[in-house]
UniProtKB/Swiss-Prot annotation:
GO CC terms: mitochondrial inner membrane peptidase complex
Domain of life of the native organism: Eukaryota
Coiled-coil boundaries: none
Keyword Mitochondrion recorded: yes
Record keywords, A-Z: Membrane, Mitochondrion, Mitochondrion inner membrane, Transit peptide
Protein name per the record: Protein SOM1, mitochondrial
Length: 71
């Protein structure tokens, strides 16, 4: 199970990303599956995260997935 991710508003995310200099973009592909009676039908979707080192040495992951990520 993935560690919990804080949910932040866009303005808060942008402020946090401006402070981080050592950031890299990470992606994760998940599947959303549904059973249609005979088979499972799974649709992959991508999630994007900005992974930044903060001043105290911790790693901060901020999800930056938007509506255009999976188009």
């Amino acid at each position: 199970m993935a560690p919990p991710t804080k949910i932040l508003g866009l303005d808060t995310q942008q402020r946090m990303l401006q402070r981080g200099e050592n950031c890299s973009l990470k992606s994760l592909v998940q599947n959303e599956c549904a059973f249609n009676g005979n088979d499972y039908v799974c649709t992959p979707f991508k999630r994007l995260f900005e992974q930044c080192m903060v001043k105290d040495g911790r790693v901060l992951n901020i999800e930056v997935t938007n509506l255009n990520t999976n188009r």
